[in-house]
Every structure is written in C-alpha cells, then in structure tokens.
Amino acid sequence: MSNRELRVGLVGAGLMGSDHATRIHRRISGASLVAVGDPDLERAERAAAGIEGCQVETDPLKVIEASDVDAVVLATPGRTHEPLLLAAIERGIPVLCEKPLTPDSKSSLRVVEAEVAAGRRLVQVGFMRRFDPEYAELKRTLHAGALGRPLLMHCAHRNASAPPGFTSQMMIFDSVVHEFDTTRWLLGEEITAVSVRHPRSTANAPSGMTDPQLVTIETASGVLVTVEIFVNCGFGYQVRCEAVCEGGTAQVGGDSGMTTHVRGAWGGSVAPDFRPRFQQAFDEELQRWADAARAGGIDGASAWDGCAAAAACEAGVAAQTSGARTPVQLVERPGLYA
C-alpha cells in the first residue's frame, strides 16, 4: 500500500470530524477521503460535499468494513469507540481515534488486548499536542537535560465556554485527559495519583458544575504537575505548560501573533477555540498518521497511551467526588508497547 494513495474512511462528521474531512481533502498528501459515516445523513453529506467519489453512510460500521477503505479516522463520541475500534482491529486496518480511546480503563484495556492478540499496533489516539511545534520543542529540551531534572510542571487549560450538557466529569475526561497524556509523554513516566481541589466557582458555570478546578498529578519519580482547568473563562482558548527543572524553566503556550499599540493601549487577540491554536498540530498529526498508515502502522500515541490516560481520568473523577488523593490503577504495560 505504501506506493499508492491511502483511501481514508471518516466515522463521525461533527465539529472535529468535519474539520478532519476538510483537512484530509485539502492538506494531507498521499491520502484521499473516500467515505464518511454518521448516523445523521445530512451531517455526513455536508462533510463529504465537494469531494468527488466520497460515499456517505449512516452506519459507521459499513465505512470500517468497506473494501475500498484502507484506514479510518474515528471522530465519534467516546462512548461509541470500543466496537468501532474492535472492528477496525479485526479488519487489520490502521485507525486514528480522537480522544478518548474509550470512556473507561476497562473498555480501553479490551482494545489493548485486541491489538495484542492481533500482534500489531493499529490504533493511534489523537493527542495532537505531541505534534505541536512548541510542545515538541519542550519535549526535546527536557530530553536533552540542559535544564536538569524536571521537578514541577504548571499547566493551564482554558475554554471560553463549555457546550451544553458539559459536566464536571467531562472536565476530566474531555479536557484534562490532554494534560494526562502530555505529562506522560513529556516526562516519560507513568502517573501514580491524582487529586482535585475546588476553588470558588465562576458565576458563568452551569448549575451543578464547579469551575475552575485545580488538578494535581503525581508521577512515578515524584514530579508534581498542577493543572488549572477552566472551561468557562469567557475570554477565549488558552493552553499553557511550564516545566520547572533543577537548572531552569521552560514554558510553552504563551501569547503570540500580532499586537497593536493604539490610543495609549496595547493588545492582541486570543484564539476563540482549539482549532486555530492547534491547526498546525492537527495537520502534522494527520500527515504523519497517513504516511505511517500507508505502511500499515501508526506514528503517535498508541492504544496503551490511551488506556493509561483513561486510568488517570478515572482517578481524577474519583478525586473530584471524594476530595482525596486517588491512586491510578494501571495494569502492567504489554510487551507490544515496550
């Protein structure tokens, strides 16, 4: 397959899926979108509009099982992922799965076990920060060791507003899941425990939600990571990370772009949501995944990484309720992911 174009099927045509449809069609080389599956036919048709020969289906499994589909991008809600991932693994085709891998560690482990039984790493989880130039530079800086050993990390994850139906638990599973993955990826070690504190809540939070929250992550070597998660901050989208090391600090996610100076004031703009902030990361992620998928593999976060993130999320949700430090329950890493 490596010498011909990758025929991609997209499952899920919502905000993220439709964005990926445009990305694959316009900006990813060596790949073409041949099918879109979504229970909402009109939504699937909108995502496929203008793409010659792209078929639409209301049954996502038909996309995965189609003989002319070489690989799949999965952008449906997390609760639907497990059967779709298992179908892709059974067919032996690579799949890029938007986070989360699944909503809980037990179902994530079943996906891992299916891959282990197949003997191939076919599932890549869409943790796009690994492909962001700033985060990649931070990873290289920490790995080089010039700043000494990492001691602390401080993170902030802010959204202008949460969508309808967004819950406190989703602050962990849909938002802080990214910090769980970047912590493991940047530091190269597992998360051992999670704590959650609830400061004074914004008046903009919907009934039943405490926002913001402060999450503390503990790693195997003793590094502490603080995460401010604020999903109704009101002013825009920000993601920041500062690593505090023995010999210095390194920070990513600062304000950038054009600034203006007028009438005695200076200022700039804040991204309205995640898409402009991480467009380059999404493009790089999809391109590298497509290149790897043409050779039958992946190039990014594995199913095991998704399973480890799910275990950390479960500890985080438990800590939200109990207020106590909650250990992360994670099985031993299978040899396939060594």
Swiss-Prot record:
Report the EC number(s), separated by commas if there are several: 1.1.1.18
* A Pfam family matched in the record: GFO_IDH_MocA_C3
The EC class name is: oxidoreductase
Keyword field: NAD, Oxidoreductase
Q: Which GO terms describe its biological process?
A: inositol catabolic process
Which catalysed reactions does the entry list for this protein? myo-inositol + NAD(+) = scyllo-inosose + NADH + H(+)
- GO molecular function term, any single one: nucleotide binding
Q: List the disulfide bonds.
A: none
Instruction: Return the Gene3D superfamilies for the record.
Output: Dihydrodipicolinate Reductase, domain 2, NAD(P)-binding Rossmann-like Domain
| Family, similarity comment | Belongs to the Gfo/Idh/MocA family.
**Quaternary structure note:** Homotetramer.
What is the annotated role of this protein in its UniProt record? Answer: Involved in the oxidation of myo-inositol (MI) to 2-keto-myo-inositol (2KMI or 2-inosose).
- UniProt-recorded name of the protein: Inositol 2-dehydrogenase 4
